Amino acid sequence: VTGAEPEPESEPPHPALGLDEVVHQKTRLALLTVLDEAGRADFSYLKRTLSLTDGNLGRHLDVLAEQGLVQLDKGYAGRRPKTWATITAKGEQALAAEMRLLAALLSRFEAGKRD
């Protein structure tokens, strides 16, 4: 007998540690949420809905596309060039995981307010 104390039960990691840097950024989280609701949306709709500039929207869509969270398709509506964004299965999974973590954070916050 060494007299060592038993290992304390390990607590699960704090939900904030699991937040995804790519998804959690405000504009990208908003884009994924809008695309999850709409399924597919064109650049103009996203720009108008989220009050973004062309450059800002383009950059955030590129980041999401690079991570495989959205698919960007370019084409034409009549003679006008158009870009459409669609959330991918990976994007849906990432958004759902982020929302679960945010819900866990909210639960912890609300539990702390009752004390």
Q: Across the structure, where does each feature detected by a protein language model lie?
A:
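Amphipathic alpha-helical dimerization/coiled-coil segments
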Residues: 2-16, 33, 92-115
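Short, hydrophobic-biased segments on the C-terminal half of alpha helices
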Residues: 61-62
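Glycine-centered, phosphate/nucleic-acid-interacting loop/turn motifs that mediate DNA/RNA or nucleotide
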Residues: 68
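Short beta-strand "wing" residues that participate in macromolecule-binding interfaces
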Residues: 72
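Accessory beta->alpha helical hairpin/"wing" motif in late/C-terminal subdomains of nucleic-acid enzymes
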Residues: 87-91
